[in-house]
Regions:
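Alpha-helical transmembrane segments of multipass membrane proteins
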Residues: 12, 86, 90, 145, ...
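Structural signal for the C-terminal ends of transmembrane alpha-helices
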Residues: 59-66, 147-153, 190-201, 282-290, ...
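Alpha-helical transmembrane segments and terminal signal-anchor/GPI-anchor hydrophobic tails
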Residues: 184, 194-303, 309-319, 326, ...
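Functionally critical transmembrane alpha-helices in membrane proteins and complexes, commonly lining
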Residues: 1-61, 82-83, 87
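Transmembrane alpha-helical segments and their boundary/interface "anchor" motifs
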Residues: 41-50, 62-96, 106, 110-126, ...
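Interfacial loop-to-helix transition and helix-capping segments at the boundaries
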Residues: 35-48, 123-137, 169-188, 256-281, ...
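Membrane-proximal cytoplasmic C-terminal regulatory module of class A 7TM GPCRs
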Residues: 362-377
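Aromatic-anchored segments of alpha-helical transmembrane domains
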Residues: 10-14, 162-175, 249-260, 307-314
């Protein structure tokens, strides 16, 4: 799911109708705008809430007070250091690019000064890499994780806390460090990790139990893999049916929330509900199907998240410059949509090539930029 959400994030930043339309807004351009907006908003905007849900669940899964220091230490290397380094890279890159007239229009910035104040602004306000607002929020959520655990550890208090956050979001009682909606996503996943882990993971547990029963063993071992790396065990029929039913219910809830979210003057709470419902629905369906083995190019989540914006910006703006004579035409609309839907694949390919290069020739740099993540399982 991390890789799927990474693709959604790329589409959020891939919107390009304004670059190719030449100011045209009717006919084919209106259709192109609706298509890209639906994908970028309807699907793309669930990515970061999905990241919050997964990050929180993994943090609080098997959590206890004696593990807090270890959890914090691991997040320093996997979240904090990459956040600081990537923001500095973006700042230095923009600063250098802004001094070359030929590419200044591509980066879209005037000459950027080099100063301690600007470096601090780049890191503390993610001024040159707005995509890192997610990691910025995640850092604060990790800091307050002991408070969240203390609240959700008790079932009743945890539910009261989540209901309180729902009302806070509805009443626009906003915080910045962290945002109220981010705190809601993180707390919901924490509650499930502490109290409802069996519900979340029962499909995998039943599949493993079924395989062990069929093979006459009680050993705790993984089901075998076939020649392609797929799990060779067969998911029990009743598990598939239940996951499909849960996924179908999730689809109906998601559609209902989406329609309410898109209504004029809709309450922001519907947006939060929609952005929670879709990742949970994806998880329900994923538990009922036999997923292929995770490939190395799917494991570059942090690196892909960090670098995709550069790739998207240069491909979109570069293509728009090359085809500027077609701006506003039907051909340009077709080009914009083709580029839009190809950008995730382009970003993944470019990111993976760079990742393989770093892993082979600069492994220390790769560890820092990826937060210690590995391409190979």
């Amino acid at each position: 799911l991390m890789f799927l959400f990474s693709i959604f994030v790329i589409w959020v930043h891939s919107y390009n109708v304004d670059l190719f339309s030449g100011g045209a807004q009717d006919g084919i351009w209106s259709l192109a705008d609706r298509i890209e907006n639906f994908v970028s908003v309807g699907l793309g905007q669930i990515a970061v809430p999905g990241f919050f849900l997964l990050s929180s669940y993994l943090f609080f899964r098997n959590f206890s007070w004696d593990k807090i220091v270890g959890k914090w230490k691991s997040r320093v290397f996997s979240v904090l250091i990459p956040y600081v380094v990537w923001n500095l890279i973006y700042y230095l890159g923009y600063m250098a690019a802004s001094r070359f007239l030929a590419i200044r229009s591509v980066v879209g910035r005037d000459i950027i000064p080099f100063s301690v104040q600007e470096i601090w602004r780049a890191v503390s306000q993610y001024a040159y890499a707005p995509i890192f607002w997610y990691l910025y929020q995640l850092i604060f959520l990790i800091i307050v994780s002991p408070m969240i655990y203390a609240l959700v550890k008790n079932r009743a208090i945890g539910l009261f806390w989540i209901v309180g956050l729902v009302f806070a979001v509805h009443l626009h009682l906003d915080m910045r460090h962290p945002n109220t909606d981010a705190l809601l996503y993180y707390s919901v996943a924490a509650y499930f990790a502490v109290h409802r882990r069996g519900l979340v993971e029962r499909s995998m547990e039943e599949e493993a139990a079924g395989w062990k029963a069929n093979h006459g063993t009680r050993e705790k071992k993984a089901a075998p893999e076939d020649k392609d790396g797929n799990t060779a065990s067969v998911i029990p029929a009743h598990v598939r049916r239940r996951c499909f039913a849960e996924g179908l219910a999730g689809v109906m809830i998601s559609v209902f929330c989406y329609r309410r979210m898109m209504a004029p003057e809709a309450a922001v709470l519907w947006t939060c509900f929609y952005r929670m419902a879709v990742p949970m629905t994806c998880w329900a369906f994923a538990c009922g199907v036999r997923l292929p083995k995770i490939r190395p190019w799917m494991r570059q989540s942090m690196f892909l998240y960090a670098i995709h914006f550069i790739v998207v910006r240069f491909v979109n703006k570069g293509t728009a410059v090359v085809t500027r004579s077609l701006a506003g035409t039907t051909t340009a609309a077709g080009i914009s949509l083709v580029v839009y839907f190809l950008l995730p694949a382009i970003a993944v390919i470019v990111s993976y090539i760079l990742a393989k290069f770093l892993v082979r020739f600069l492994p220390g740099v790769w560890r820092v930029l990826s937060g210690g993540r590995k391409l190979e399982g």
